[in-house]
């Protein structure tokens, strides 16, 4: 084999290996919603979105410091005890991992396409064990709340990360098949995003939010921001 052809083949093989280790292409939307019922006041509504939300911007130096100042996932507001479904086929990786937050209970499922899903603020410890196989649409948990009393903040916190390392977070709206624009119209949480007045169009759409690297540099430290009342 000619040396040039040999190098080309080797480069192609290396690229194939690297690409094979990456999560599935973003435009495939391989996952489904983690809830069984249609949205509505008696079932569930969209809560805080993923990314550069106004609330995350306000809490960028505290609650969301580890997420580069952004909200790690998307919240589904629902009464405590609402069934939570696996968004795709996979294997249970962790149950009640303190490392990944979203307490009092959480669950991580590694999916075959290189992604992992984290289900947080669960009502009780999921009745699953690491290594157990689960199917898309299977009930895996119940919604709870971070305050432990289910008085007013019942919701599911859902994250999509890189399987195995869990250091990279992705926008669920780019990976879950759903009409996100319609869902955002009736949610219980405002869908505003913080605005950098020096680049006011950046990160202003549900599906236009950036990936997050855990403990990476802050992405939303703006000299001038909107809304002004949230600045520090």
Tell where the protein language model's regions lie, with residue ranges.
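Solvent-exposed loop/turn segments at secondary-structure junctions
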Residues: 81-83, 97-100, 114-116, 124-125, ...
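Conserved beta-strand positions that form and line the central face of beta-propeller blades
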Residues: 75, 108, 118, 142, ...
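Short amphipathic beta-strand/extended segments with alternating polar/hydrophobic composition
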Residues: 47-49, 54-58, 119-122, 167-179
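N-terminal Sec-pathway targeting helices
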Residues: 1-11
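Zn2+-dependent peptidoglycan hydrolase active-site motif and core
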Residues: 87-126, 130, 153-157
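Conserved, short, structured surface segments that act as functional micro-motifs
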Residues: 111, 132-202
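Surface-exposed, glycine-biased beta-strand/turn segments
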Residues: 16-105, 136, 185-232
């Amino acid at each position: 084999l000619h040396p040039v052809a040999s190098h080309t083949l080797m480069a192609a093989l290396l690229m194939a290996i690297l690409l094979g280790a990456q999560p599935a292409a973003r435009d495939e939307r391989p996952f489904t919603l983690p809830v069984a019922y249609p949205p509505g006041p008696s079932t569930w509504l969209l809560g805080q979105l993923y990314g550069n939300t106004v609330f995350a911007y306000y809490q960028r130096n505290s609650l969301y410091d580890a997420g580069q100042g952004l909200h790690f996932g998307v919240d589904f507001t629902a009464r405590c005890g609402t069934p939570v479904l696996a968004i795709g086929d996979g294997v249970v990786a962790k149950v009640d991992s303190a490392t990944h937050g979203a307490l009092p209970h959480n669950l991580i499922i590694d999916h075959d396409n290189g992604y992992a899903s984290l289900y947080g603020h669960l009502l009780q410890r999921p009745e699953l064990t690491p290594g157990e196989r689960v199917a898309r649409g299977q009930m895996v948990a119940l919604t709870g709340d971070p305050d432990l009393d289910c008085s007013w903040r019942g919701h599911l916190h859902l994250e999509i990360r890189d399987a195995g390392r869990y250091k990279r977070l992705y926008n669920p709206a780019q990976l879950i098949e759903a009409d996100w624009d319609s869902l955002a119209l009736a949610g219980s949480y405002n869908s505003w995003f913080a605005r950098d007045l020096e680049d006011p169009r950046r990160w202003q759409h549900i599906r236009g939010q950036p990936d997050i690297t855990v403990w990476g540099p802050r992405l939303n430290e703006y000299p001038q921001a909107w809304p002004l009342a949230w600045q520090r």
